[in-house]
Amino acid sequence: ALSAAEAEVVAKSWGPVFANKDANGDNFLIALFEAYPDSPNFFADFKGKSIADIRASPKLRNVSSRIVSRLNEFVSSAADAGKMAAMLDQFSKEHAGFGVGSQQFQNVSAMFPGFVASIAAPPAGADAAWGKLFGLIIDAMKKAGK
């Protein structure tokens, strides 16, 4: 889990993203797909589709809203070790079942702080705190065999 201070920094930087969650969720997913062109293939709805087709797809909002909601749960529980352990266990098993591994979350971790900063200037320490949060997800994926 994150320390209380780390969780607070993550929550403060997440606030502006979540305030416009629909558009920001869509924009993040498109940015991920542009940065890592193999990423759409991990989503049944987007496998083999072009960025233009994904952007025009009514499924984009469905997928991005699920991701934003799940990330919001992690942000809300970041300092609660018990909740985080249970959530990470379930999340990692679920995603391993989808064929998603730690590398995909390393990709997200590499670009997410910059995405957050593109929406609103994050508080000091936000990049490191997001890195720690995604590090927990990456470690859970590795434990799940991915």
From Swiss-Prot:
Domain Globin: from-to ranges: 1-146
Keywords: Acetylation, Heme, Iron, Metal-binding, Muscle protein, Oxygen transport, Transport
Binding annotation for heme b: H95
Gene Ontology annotations for the cellular component aspect, listed alphabetically: extracellular region; hemoglobin complex
Gene3D superfamilies per the UniProt record, alphabetical: Globins
PANTHER family: CYTOGLOBIN, GLOBIN FAMILY PROFILE DOMAIN-CONTAINING PROTEIN
Quaternary state and interactors: Monomer.
Descriptive protein name: Globin
Organism: Dolabella auricularia
